[in-house]
A protein has these predicted regions:
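A short, Lys/Arg-rich alpha-helix, primarily the initiator
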Residues: 2-28
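Helix-turn-helix DNA-binding elements, focusing on the entry/boundary residues of the two helices
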Residues: 22, 33, 44, 58-61, ...
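Residues in the recognition helix of alpha-helical DNA-binding motifs
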Residues: 25, 39, 50, 78
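The alpha-helix within a helix-turn-helix
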Residues: 26, 37, 65
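Short alpha-helical DNA-recognition segment
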Residues: 29-48
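Short, basic-rich loop-to-helix N-cap that marks the start of a DNA-contacting helix
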Residues: 53-66
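Short C-terminal boundary/hinge segments that cap the last helix of small helical domains
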Residues: 69-80
Length: 80
């Protein structure tokens, strides 16, 4: 059974981990956020916010994962 998130702090921690993982995957492509966002048609301000663990829509996250060529399952597999 999956663990439940027990507090707002935990949600914030999870958001930061999601952002860190997006940043890690982008950096593995040897791209800074400005170049990567331009090449993939993603607003650089939005990408920067996501990478900092700020609010992100599911639609935006799915678009980014598609551009990174990463499945949702693989992306969340390492996030605890």
């Amino acid at each position: 059974m999956a663990k439940k998130i027990s507090s707002e702090a935990s949600v914030d921690q999870q958001m930061k981990k999601i952002g860190e993982k997006v940043r890690e995957l982008r950096r593995q492509m040897n791209q800074n956020y400005e170049a990567w966002s331009y090449l993939n048609g993603i607003n650089k301000v939005s990408l920067n916010r996501i990478e900092r663990g700020e609010n992100v829509t599911m639609k935006m996250l799915l678009e980014i994962l598609k551009k990174l060529d990463v499945s949702v399952q693989d992306f969340f597999n390492g996030i605890r």
